[in-house]
Amino acid sequence: MESQRSFFIIVFLIVSFILWKIWDDEHHINLLNIENNHSTLQPYSIQSHESNQNTPITHTNNPYSHIITIKTDVFLLKINTYSGNIEEAYLNNYQENLNSQKPLKLLHTSKENKYQAYIDIETLNEYFTNDLNQKNKKHYLYYSNTTNQCEYILKNNENKLQFDLTYQGPNNIIYTKRYLLNRNDYSIYITYIIDNQSTYPIHIKLYGNLIQSIHSDVIQSKHNDHCPLYTYQEAAYSTDTEKYQKYNLKDIKHTNLNIHSTNGWIALLQKYFIIALLPITPKDNTFYTTYLNNHDISIGFKSDFIHIPPGKKNELQSILWMGPKIQDNMKLVAPNLDLVIDYGWLWFISHPLFKLLQFIHTYTIDNWGISIILITVIIRLIMYPLTKAQYTSMAKIRMLQPKLISIQEEYKHDKYQYHQKTIELYKKEKVNPLGGCLPLLIQMPIFLALYYMLSESVELRHAKFAFWIKDLSDQDPYYILPIIMGITMFFIQKLSPTTITDPIQKKIMNIMLVIFTIFFLWFPSGLVLYYIISNIITIIQQQVIYHDLSKKGLHNKK
């Protein structure tokens, strides 16, 4: 087996797999447009226990609706006092796109493209809603902040920001919705405090919902910065029995989720960002999905009813996580939440590779491009013994080519004898015909794991490298890196010994070079950089190995 031919065949299979994965991700699901549109504030209703789904309703010119602005080091939030929920959320440390100074808008309520998270309560005794129709005898659920402030800011000398929204219900039942935000933390702790000062017991249920618009067309998100490597933009959940499970949004229309669990979380996923709800107390919850209004889906949780006697208080707690897919942060919030970083079936390799990349970035130069170069060098040096074994085995097989051709000519009419004599020759010369292929096959999972790791890392989003490369997660705007990669592949082919004499096969090899280069035109710069460095190392290792083989009489390039 010729070295360059085996290399290109396996690379071709890998690239084909990657492209199939991209196509499947783009066409199997409805990608969701979460473009930063001008939003209209739309509070959502709290449903009665008789309803099976939490359907949002719209209110315009609501006299009870006031907006409170929350500013921390990582968040800019806008909370509607009429629902007590977050209407808009911005991530201060992430921009909409590379050329924008505007913070990334993660939650919004535009009619066409909803992307929302809300947490509410309902009771058996009182039905709260944002519906102002008094004929239905429904109580208003509007809050007032205890300090009458319109803006809360986390000061530089503070590590946490806490504020309360209160609602005075009928019969002296006081409802407090408490928000707690910590510095450098994408977790928002939301606690309902129900003070039953009435003369009768009440029963309270906590529920939360994540809502997202879906469309019939495949819509590409601007938040992906036109990167062609889409990952699973779907819902996900974790329960007592399933550590991590993805849930196809389009399946919600036909099959609703309904799972009881005492632990877990629900989430909506983007390529680099996530919103998740984690019920803390009560422990017993049901995770469910709902198809809304022919174009919105909801994944949510609802607790069992809890009993609050007269004169008693109770607290219902949950966590809303909104932010980037940062492994170290998410695994501290909830078990298995870090699994939303989709490393595919090679996660057990990708995860330690990311830890190594993170270590290199932390303790060397503060440049993710340099870190990619260093991790590539380290991996290729570790795999050098396999590379040398591969080239040595191929060299031995090349030295046997004259004898193999002679056997083929002698037994061309007797396939059985031909195979027998070939095997005998391999045994006599102590050559494994698969010796050149097996080391390469062992290396391929590592290369694929690196691909998954680099394509999933939010750390590379808008990360500068050098010169014209301003975003390692986006394609090279001038296609210089893909062209350089194509040149390195050309040198690998030309410097590799070959016995191919068929001009058609030579043309096919050259065409494959062009095809691979075209494939990589739209790949993220970080991935292309990795392949360039890997190819350069391959060229260097080739020359070192061939020089050593020449001394042993095993290399004679034609």
UniProtKB/Swiss-Prot annotation:
According to the UniProt entry, its GO molecular function terms are: membrane insertase activity
Q: Does the keyword Transcription regulation apply?
A: no
Any coiled-coil regions, as ranges = none
What domain of life?
Bacteria
Q: Give the matching InterPro entries.
A: Membr_insert_YidC (IPR019998), Membr_insert_YidC_N (IPR028053), YidC/ALB3/OXA1/COX18 (IPR001708), YidC/Oxa/ALB_C (IPR028055), YidC_ALB_C (IPR047196), YidC_periplasmic_sf (IPR038221)
* Bilayer topology term: Multi-pass membrane protein
The listed locations are: Cell inner membrane
Q: How does it assemble?
A: Interacts with the Sec translocase complex via SecD. Specifically interacts with transmembrane segments of nascent integral membrane proteins during membrane integration.
What does the sequence similarity comment in the record state about its family?
Belongs to the OXA1/ALB3/YidC family. Type 1 subfamily.
What HAMAP family does the database record attribute to this sequence?
YidC_type1
The identity of this protein, by name, is: Membrane protein insertase YidC
Highest classification ranks of the organism: Bacteria, Pseudomonadati, Pseudomonadota, Gammaproteobacteria, Enterobacterales
